[in-house]
């Protein structure tokens, strides 16, 4: 199945992550902390913690640091308590934006997120104002040049819902959140290594931006992503 090109967006995101690895680690540590506190410190019995550990390994976080943060969150050591808060709003051209945060000070966080929205012409919405435009899915993306036939065969056999190839040849595998790990592991066992593998909020439809609106939207997204309390940013703009 064909789809819009998203390869440039992936490369932009990976480039920014490489530039700020320390911040990526901070976000992952927060995710490990919340996952371990809510579901326990045993990864085999805590899917959310398993995914957080996978993110940590992908970001080259040392194993002893991963273990330390799991132990800390599980109650062995004293730590900071984080609250998960989701904000929703609109960016340039009415594009929908979801901002997931983990914070120890919700007053600070909402002020910073609201400021980022307003600085570049966006605006905060109410709870539920844009979330209905997204679907929670497992997403596994392969670089252009990967065998589409092989990905499709393995993914669908393992329980994937859809396989989409974009205009540049990048291949996107979509799964139900509960099937994500099984599909990802089956693809890995077949020698297929993805560029992206995560459970995410995927837009049901996208909004095309043109001219200066593209740069303005990217600046808005970058500013939100750079906020200390922000974990993930989802949007439906074509950039």
UniProtKB/Swiss-Prot annotation:
GO terms for cellular component: cytosol. Coiled coil: none annotated. GO terms for biological process: regulation of DNA-templated transcription. It holds the Pfam family TACO1_YebC_N. One of its GO terms (molecular function) is DNA binding. NCBIfam families: PRK00110.1, PRK12378.1, YebC/PmpR family DNA-binding transcriptional regulator. This is Probable transcriptional regulatory protein Ajs_1898. The lineage of its organism: Bacteria, Pseudomonadati, Pseudomonadota, Betaproteobacteria, Burkholderiales.
């Amino acid at each position: 199945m064909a789809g819009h090109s998203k390869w440039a967006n992936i490369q932009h995101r990976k480039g920014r992550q490489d530039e700020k690895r320390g911040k990526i680690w901070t976000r992952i540590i927060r995710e490990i902390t919340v996952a371990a506190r809510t579901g326990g410190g045993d990864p085999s019995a805590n899917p959310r913690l398993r995914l957080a550990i996978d993110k940590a390994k992908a970001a080259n976080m040392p194993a002893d640091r991963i273990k330390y943060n799991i132990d800390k969150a599980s109650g062995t050591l004293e730590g900071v308590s984080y609250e998960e808060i989701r904000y929703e709003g609109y960016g340039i051209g009415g594009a929908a934006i979801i901002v997931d945060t983990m914070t120890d000070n919700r007053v600070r966080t909402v002020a910073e997120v609201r400021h980022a929205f307003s600085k570049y012409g966006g605006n905060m919405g109410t709870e539920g104002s844009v979330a209905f435009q997204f679907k929670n899915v497992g997403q596994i993306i392969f670089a252009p040049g990967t065998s589409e036939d092989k990905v499709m065969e393995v993914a669908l056999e393992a329980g994937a819902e859809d396989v989409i190839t974009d205009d540049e040849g990048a291949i996107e595998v979509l799964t139900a959140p509960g099937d994500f790990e099984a599909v990802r592991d089956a693809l890995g066992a077949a020698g297929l290594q993805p560029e992206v593998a995560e459970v995410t909020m995927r837009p049901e439809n996208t909004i095309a931006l043109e001219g200066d609106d593209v740069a303005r939207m990217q600046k808005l997204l970058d500013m939100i992503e750079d906020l200390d309390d922000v974990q993930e940013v989802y949007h439906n703009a074509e950039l």
